[in-house]
């Protein structure tokens, strides 16, 4: 059974190297999806952190605030919690930036592979989602 239109034949041979490139493309797509999901979670966490920072600033400075460390909550002064939240926000910003860099690298490699594979296979291959 052929998937080409009737009367059209596929004369393109798939070499081992071509198959390796197709497999790499598939792996990169899966990695990109995982990074996109992680990036979404980190951005959401950053939003929550920003919201909490704004709320903490409204609290009286002498009032102790519960701050989550691992699985437990400890009481800290408002100023220390604010400083810790700033450190956490900076850590998240760095993580988001790293993930975005990875995503850009994957996108550039995907574009290169698309160009190579479409040049060889033309309409005989579909690399779009």
UniProtKB/Swiss-Prot annotation:
Keyword Ribonucleoprotein among UniProt keywords: no
Disulfide-linked positions: none
InterPro entries per UniProt: PFD_beta-like, PFDN4, Prefoldin
Gene Ontology CC terms, in alphabetical order: cytoplasm; prefoldin complex
Modified sites of kind N-acetylmethionine: 1
Sequence similarity: Belongs to the prefoldin subunit beta family.
Subunit structure: Heterohexamer of two PFD-alpha type and four PFD-beta type subunits.
Name of the molecule in the record: Prefoldin subunit 4
């Amino acid at each position: 059974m052929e998937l080409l239109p009737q009367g059209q034949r596929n004369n393109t041979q798939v070499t081992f190297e071509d198959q390796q490139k197709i497999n790499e493309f598939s792996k990169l797509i899966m990695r990109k999806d995982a990074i996109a999901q992680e990036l979404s979670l980190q951005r959401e966490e950053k939003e929550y952190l920003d919201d909490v920072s704004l709320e903490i600033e409204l609290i009286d400075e002498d009032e102790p605030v519960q701050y989550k460390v691992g699985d437990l909550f400890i009481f800290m002064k408002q100023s220390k919690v604010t400083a810790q939240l700033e450190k956490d926000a900076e850590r998240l910003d760095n993580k988001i930036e790293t993930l975005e860099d990875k995503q850009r690298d994957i996108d550039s490699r995907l574009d290169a592979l698309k160009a190579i594979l479409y040049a060889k296979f033309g309409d005989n291959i579909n690399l779009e989602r």
